[in-house]
């Protein structure tokens, strides 16, 4: 359970503020309620089904296959109904092909999450913790879902998830639902908003249940620029 708690509290790289135990590190809190849910994922009237889903997925696969690195600023907004408020954090996001991810939280406190292959590292208050997802099917699914959602690359999802694709005048909306009941006990669904022009991820929201969510907004994105390998250091 400790290993599962770590990867889930990693927040699917989104819920880093609170683990299954409810333990937390400081986060800037703002007032917020579920009345803002429509702004999180858009209203139903804003979106319609993509006419040619196969063509869309082909274009998306083409775009993501051309990527070697992604760098961006992010703002994480976490809502927990038990507190009836939003908690915000900011930092830098890094991704490198293949399967290297770093979330470098900078405010309100320093915190780091690194995924490098089947290894995961978290650094909190200068103390590093490590877990290995190899040989654990559920944790492997979690890691795959993280990478796919953060980069917009759906090719690795396979048959373990259902994917619904919709569009509006502003963006594409992908709703990803795990088929595994075990996974859904912790992650109800993922909603991704993609930029219509370059199909990059503008927003990623994880719904832990009907009322709690963690949302990432990405800005100042850079593609295929060199990233120092120290960013993904597992030591």
Residue map of PLM features:
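Bacterial N-terminal signal peptides
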Residues: 9-19
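N-terminal leader/targeting segments and the immediate start of mature chains
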Residues: 22-85, 230-235
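Short, solvent-exposed helix-to-loop capping segments enriched in aromatics
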Residues: 64, 141-156
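N-terminal mature ectodomain segment of secretory-pathway/periplasmic proteins
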Residues: 64-122
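A mature extracytoplasmic/lumenal domain signature
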Residues: 76-78, 99, 105-109, 117-119, ...
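Acidic/charged, solvent-exposed loop-and-adjacent secondary-structure segments enriched in E/D, K/R, S/T
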Residues: 122-148
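Gly/Pro-enriched, hydrophobic low-complexity segments
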Residues: 131, 154-235
């Amino acid at each position: 359970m400790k290993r599962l708690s770590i990867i889930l509290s990693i927040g699917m790289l989104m819920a880093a503020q609170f683990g299954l135990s409810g333990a937390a590190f400081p986060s800037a809190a703002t007032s917020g309620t579920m009345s803002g849910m429509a702004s999180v994922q858009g209203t139903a009237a804003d979106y319609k089904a993509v006419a040619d889903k196969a063509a869309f997925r082909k274009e998306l696969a083409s775009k993501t296959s051309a990527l070697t690195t992604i760098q961006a600023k992010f703002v994480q907004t976490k809502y927990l109904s038990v507190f009836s408020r939003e908690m915000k954090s900011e930092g830098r996001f890094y991704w490198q092909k293949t399967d290297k991810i770093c979330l470098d939280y900078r405010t309100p406190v320093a915190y780091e999450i690194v995924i490098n292959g089947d290894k995961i590292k978290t650094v909190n208050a200068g103390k590093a913790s490590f877990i290995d997802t190899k040989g654990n099917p559920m944790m492997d699914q979690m890691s795959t879902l993280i990478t796919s959602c953060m980069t917009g690359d759906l090719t690795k999802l396979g048959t373990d998830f259902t994917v619904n694709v919709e569009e509006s005048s502003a963006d594409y909306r992908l709703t990803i639902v795990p088929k595994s009941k075990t996974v859904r006990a912790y992650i109800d669904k993922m909603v991704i908003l993609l930029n219509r022009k370059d199909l990059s991820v503008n927003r990623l929201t994880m719904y832990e249940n009907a009322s709690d969510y963690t949302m990432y907004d990405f800005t100042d994105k850079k593609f295929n620029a060199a990233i120092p390998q120290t960013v993904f250091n597992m030591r």
